[in-house]
UniProtKB/Swiss-Prot annotation:
Family per similarity comment: Belongs to the class-I aminoacyl-tRNA synthetase family.
NCBIfam families reported in the protein's UniProt record: trpS
Residues the record lists as binding L-tryptophan: 140
Chief location bin: cytoplasm
Catalytic class of the enzyme: ligase
Source species of the chain: Mycoplasma pneumoniae (strain ATCC 29342 / M129 / Subtype 1)
Cited function: Catalyzes the attachment of tryptophan to tRNA(Trp).
The gene coding this protein: trpS
Quaternary structure and partners: Homodimer.
Transmembrane parts of this sequence: none
Chain location of the short sequence motif 'KMSKS' region per the record: 200-204
Catalytic activity: tRNA(Trp) + L-tryptophan + ATP = L-tryptophyl-tRNA(Trp) + AMP + diphosphate + H(+)
Protein residues bound to ATP: 10-12, 18-19, 152-154, 191, 200-204
GO biological process terms on file: tryptophanyl-tRNA aminoacylation
Name of the protein described by the UniProt record: Tryptophan--tRNA ligase
Amino acid sequence: MMKRALTGIQASGKQHLGNYLGVMQSLIELQEQCQLFVFVADLHSITVDFQPQALKQNNFDLVRTLLAVGLDPQKACLFLQSDLLEHSMMGYLMMVQSNLGELQRMTQFKAKKAEQTRNPNGTLNIPTGLLTYPALMAGDILLYQPDIVPVGNDQKQHLELTRDLAQRIQKKFKLKLRLPQFVQNKDTNRIMDLFDPTKKMSKSSKNQNGVIYLDDPKEVVVKKIRQATTDSFNKIRFAPKTQPGVTNMLTILKALLKEPVNQSLTNQLGNDLEAYFSTKSYLDLKNALTEATVNLLVNIQRKREQISREQVFNCLQAGKNQAQATARTTLALFYDGFGLGSQNIK
């Protein structure tokens, strides 16, 4: 039987190269190997302050980008989290099975809590949604009973909580649940900032020259890569501790060479990048990285422009219907186990 995989992506603004290589590229591979569910996590987006118009546009832009990079609605189920009320219900069921202590010890919550101010009466001015976020995530996952959940390091603790909750529910309510396995793409899990390669590439970076966005035009990509941080070793090799900037560029280039649009460049550089660049300069590395990046982005941008709002809507409606069939089956299982619903009074 084909394994089932699930991932959720927040539509929090423009997508960058780190998003593509860290998540999207692996989804294109997974849709060929698994029954893949991909949802836009818009319920998670509203756990912090948000603007409705921006949320709607971000949702549209993300779905259009996912389709442009190669996610195929015939092979993967793509949908909006908020289109299925089952997500909210499962999130609530997970919340009542969790306890305050385990939610408060989540690293992301503690970090965001430290950034918050206090109200005049001394209470913390922090949205409750930030605290219950991991419970909703656990509900998202268990609703589809996946075998595989691709994750980044920043979500690993939340996913460990999901497994804990699943085991707790299995023991207490005698439900048979799949315990999902969490997988990471070790090569591209942490694409770093080009300007400051000690930090992960992020749209919140203070210096935007270190972030390559999927809608960046060629001249902007050329400028950003040309200004990328290197070092004084003048040696091109994978050395994360001593040469983080060069290592980051090699990592990105290696991942980009998997793309069909870079086949000719792959033939030129070969499989051993350290060997190829052993007699080359940092400028040669930057030129190769620029070519590979521009090839990818031009292809994505061209395809994005061809995707209409109607296509996005139709894709999401089809995905909603497909996802709902699975979600309702799972939620019915939980209702029976918990003793919820009028059907349990017959």
